[in-house]
Amino acid sequence: MVTKKELTREAEFLTTLRTILETYEEIAATRMARIRSSVLNSRDFLLEINAIFQQVKTSYKTQTELLMQTRKIKDSSKLTFIKRNGKTLYVFISANTGLYGEIIRRTYDVFVENLRKEPGDVAILGKLGMEIFNEEKIKAPLTYFEFPDNKMDNEAVQKIVEHIIKYEKVLVFYEQFNNVISQSPIVTNISGDPLPWEKGGPQAKYFFEPSLEKIMEFFEKEIFASIFQQTIFESELAKFAARMVSLDFASENTKIRLKQVIMTRQRIKHQEDNKRQLEKFASMRLWK
């Protein structure tokens, strides 16, 4: 049977734990509020930029033959301004720690589902994603990158971009913020090729200034990195929101358990008081 002393220790522990949870929840909320507006504003802008990237790349392909004739090139792969390896890369942006609820696992499930349908190389950001991937023992060429959960590391981003830009097709799997209580897994193709559900409709014809080559070079080098950086910001925002919700849930559970412990301790105290009263009355009768 649980003693009053044990219940007192548990109550003290739960009180401390609740304070810690509320503190971390407040930190997550502050960080989320700090980047929320900028991320959401950038989201719409870069979605449009990515769509333009796709259209430019499609137009570029349709004009390849003409460009090959002009430059007397027989191999079309030489028309790209970055040497690519012809492979597909799956990038999973995870986390280094827990307390993010189920969103990391849900994103991982989408990532693995796509990887199994069409095998390719893998790049993982974050220790948690690496641990999950190793546990499942999936065989795929893998590159792991250390990356912080709560800030943008520009040097690390540059290192990652230098690795992933070599691939013909780059799919990034990450967490997206919908609202404070809802986050969802999402995949973005950052290499300028539309995903299956993004295709459709007639392709517009464009005039390119100063030239098609210059514009493609700009998109392949500069816009590629910007779109990838946005996916990291999106993941960061979604994880802050998920952590806030997870900590709030844990805090409420701690509050409920603390209330139960206090009530149990009071009940034991009443039982002890009643027992002492009965013993007192019994001893008084013996003296009469």
Task: Annotate each predicted stretch with a short phrase.
Residues 1-288:
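C-terminal beta-strand-loop-alpha-helix "lid" module of Rossmann-like NAD(P)-dependent dehydrogenases
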